[in-house]
């Protein structure tokens, strides 16, 4: 679990997302409250439930990006899902309980990676010994281990560590790969399919087979195999279940797309039906997974939606009450676009410059060009559909199309994009509303 303070979390988000201070503060406080709850005594801790967040704002203003960055900061089981992927229980499609199963899988993977990192050096040493056994078997008069190496084995060990034997082929015994069986289960029977898959995989458990590999590939394969032997899978499962129940975070995107349409009177299995199924999940229920039962009482749900065709009040009242914290994200202005093009650590202009640098082309953007690109993007958004910061991708691709095409032939040159270049390539398109609607 992350121990960062809300101020530190907002500072990290500021490196990648421009503006939207209110949304950043809300998610930062929610993330910090996970840590605060863990410090509270046991009887009261169980009574403290997370306050779920609903982020409302037009497309392209940073809702999904906040989720992506939060996943890296959380250091807790985290999953991002689209509400539109699910259908009501009993109909063809995925039911909402699969969210918790996927979250548990993410927790297993996260904890396994952490444990594997702890035994990395031991696994590397064990893999090295097995490769050396294939290259120079132990003589009966020499003891196993580095200190008891024969002179020939010591020489091969030095060459192996220097990388001189990377391309040499050796034969090693490795665990047989499990049988790959993909079982498509009907909705509600995913647990049965996973049990059947485990059954097929257990047929080959403990079996080995001889493979001929290059030393480089053998070291990598054996390191993974040795690390797998050193970590306790049962302990990982127990820790993952606990981490999901106490610190799990679910980011539910496109929530507005499952609002019921007023002009539609039939059964809406992928809209209101999904909302009804989400209710117990968000409120707190028990979900069966292949790792055990998961209680969802303390899982934090962060939902987001553009709500341009629907309103938050179009959600069923019970679900509205499950998201007590409402945050509105602001539409982006031309000044925001300027900041997006320059301020983030991996700004769009820096990305394009780095891509063209691989061809030997030095690309620079003048301040006047950045201001003009931002202004054109904002104007096109205002006149056509407002797609937020995603408009910058479209405009920059169009602007740099010619340079990108000819870059391989212009190696060693420097190109500076100024306002005149922008107007020459985009000015007429931006002014023509019909053209900009289809091209920009």
Swiss-Prot record:
Localization per Swiss-Prot or TrEMBL: Cytoplasm
InterPro entries: AAA+_ATPase, ATP-dep_Clp_protease_ClpX, ATPase_AAA_core, Clp_ATPase_C, HslU, P-loop_NTPase
Molecular functions per Gene Ontology: ATP binding; ATP hydrolysis activity; peptidase activity; proteasome-activating activity
Database matches in Pfam families: AAA, AAA_2
Transmembrane segments: none
Record's keyword terms, sorted: ATP-binding, Chaperone, Cytoplasm, Nucleotide-binding
Domain of life: Bacteria
GO cellular component, one term: HslUV protease complex
Binding site for ATP: 18, 60-65, 253, 318, 390
Gene Ontology annotations of biological process type: protein unfolding; proteolysis involved in protein catabolic process
Function: ATPase subunit of a proteasome-like degradation complex; this subunit has chaperone activity. The binding of ATP and its subsequent hydrolysis by HslU are essential for unfolding of protein substrates subsequently hydrolyzed by HslV. HslU recognizes the N-terminal part of its protein substrates and unfolds these before they are guided to HslV for hydrolysis.
Oligomeric and partner information: A double ring-shaped homohexamer of HslV is capped on each side by a ring-shaped HslU homohexamer. The assembly of the HslU/HslV complex is dependent on binding of ATP.
Family per similarity comment: Belongs to the ClpX chaperone family. HslU subfamily.
Name of the protein in its database record: ATP-dependent protease ATPase subunit HslU
Gene it is expressed from: hslU
